[in-house]
């Protein structure tokens, strides 16, 4: 199993990264330090997670202590929906860089295709609980992203939560300067995403799988929701390999040639999630896990379902 996938830019992106969505600010600095000490070199961040400053403290300590060199780290962040208007993109990126205490990002993604009304509120809602859109078009947002590459603020740019028609719209943009290097999407055995993954690969776009464990700590979880970590069928596969269910769920996307970014702030779990390079799921077990697809999403962003750029009305 390769430890990296190569982006079309030639950059090597570590196949396993530390996710930081829902990592509490008080715990994420330590999580980042532990992860780097354990060998993680890829950290996945976003402005909307409201913890980039604390992630940055962990990075800064390890860089200043010369535990790791900047060029050996792969740091990803994301442009939030309230900053899609072209004149806001650079400032948003600079805020993230300042918080992370870095002078460049390895990869910067448009977090969602949906633009929201600019302002301090990350989810501006109207009286009916629907998100208030902005006037932006993500193709124009993309042009501002391209400028960040030219200015040296970011090494590569990509998208997240885009369906294949939305990716296609960027690829077909007249005068496109840089195509998306990555599409970061939700992928796990209940949402296997075969069609979208196949489409991205056919265009030379690397796919990052988020919520590989089904994000059991998501704030909107309901008791009746399915649980990947508690699924007896997946537990049985894990037992066969002498591995935990989480390790099988992390290995599964890796063997599909996807990047994967499990989140944890618990040192033991951060270590456990990295112990996935010493076993291989059989083709039969891979197919079995794929067969559990039920098109179940952790992140459906239902408050945006009426937005013109909502990505999940399409099949893929």
Curated annotation (Swiss-Prot):
Enzyme class: oxidoreductase
Family matches, as PROSITE patterns: ALDOKETO_REDUCTASE_1 (PS00798), ALDOKETO_REDUCTASE_2 (PS00062), ALDOKETO_REDUCTASE_3 (PS00063)
Highest rank taxon of the organism: Eukaryota
Residues that bind substrate: 111
Chain positions found as N6-acetyllysine: 222, 263
GO MF annotation terms: aldose reductase (NADPH) activity; all-trans-retinol dehydrogenase (NADP+) activity; allyl-alcohol dehydrogenase activity; glycerol dehydrogenase (NADP+) activity; prostaglandin H2 endoperoxidase reductase activity; retinal dehydrogenase activity
Catalytic-site annotation from UniProt: 49
Pfam families on file: Aldo_ket_red
UniProt: NADP(+) binding residues: 10-19, 211-273
Phosphoserine carried by residues: 3
Organism: Sus scrofa
EC number assigned by the record: 1.1.1.21, 1.1.1.300, 1.1.1.372, 1.1.1.54
Name the UniProt record assigns to this protein: Aldo-keto reductase family 1 member B1
Catalytic activity: an alditol + NADP(+) = an aldose + NADPH + H(+); all-trans-retinol + NADP(+) = all-trans-retinal + NADPH + H(+); 9-cis-retinol + NADP(+) = 9-cis-retinal + NADPH + H(+); 13-cis-retinol + NADP(+) = 13-cis-retinal + NADPH + H(+)
Gene3D superfamilies, per database record: NADP-dependent oxidoreductase domain (3.20.20.100)
Keyword NADP: yes
This protein's UniProt keywords: Acetylation, Cytoplasm, Lipid metabolism, NADP, Oxidoreductase, Phosphoprotein
Coiled-coil region: none
Gene designation: AKR1B1
